[in-house]
């Protein structure tokens, strides 16, 4: 099974993907590194620009028949069996990105993306099998156990469990000033 772990930057994709792969006995693949290795991604100003169709070809060709947890912001655009969209309170996203040294503009963009369900909507547009998981106030172990429980119980689609519209007023500082 090829499982994509995706979400807004700062949501905890890598931590969860590595732990999930370990618990399931699956291979862990970082999509960014995979893209660079296959020559369909290049670094520009610290970010990797990827040719999506070319990357999807390599994912299909080399990973499709293996048990893999695919970690990456664009993993929901790849040919996978299941997409897990991690969600976190937008304030948490903003704080984590500020700690990582993101610009105010990038913090605002990513907080807004989380607020309006951008990654979830993209995942639903691409795949039938999408599971949304709210990571807010949960440990990585709790999150992974929730994901494994959903997979083992046969859940293929669980979306619409997160609604940040009620916290919009609290999030305005992150949209305007990157959290300051």
UniProtKB/Swiss-Prot annotation:
It catalyses: AMP + ATP = 2 ADP; ATP + H2O = ADP + phosphate + H(+). Its EC number is 2.7.4.3. The keyword ATP-binding applies. The keyword Ribosomal protein does not apply. Transmembrane segments: none annotated. ATP binds at residues 10, 12-15, 100, 138. Residues 30-50 are annotated as: NMP. InterPro entries: Adenyl_kinase_AK6, P-loop_NTPase. Keywords: ATP-binding, Kinase, Nucleotide-binding, Ribosome biogenesis, rRNA processing, Transferase. NCBIfam families: PRK03839.1. Interacts with uS11. Not a structural component of 40S pre-ribosomes, but transiently interacts with them by binding to uS11. Broad-specificity nucleoside monophosphate (NMP) kinase that catalyzes the reversible transfer of the terminal phosphate group between nucleoside triphosphates and monophosphates. Also has ATPase activity. Involved in the late maturation steps of the 30S ribosomal particles, specifically 16S rRNA maturation. While NMP activity is not required for ribosome maturation, ATPase activity is. Associates transiently with small ribosomal subunit protein uS11. ATP hydrolysis breaks the interaction with uS11. This is Putative adenylate kinase. The lineage of its organism: Archaea, Methanobacteriati, Methanobacteriota, Thermococci, Thermococcales.
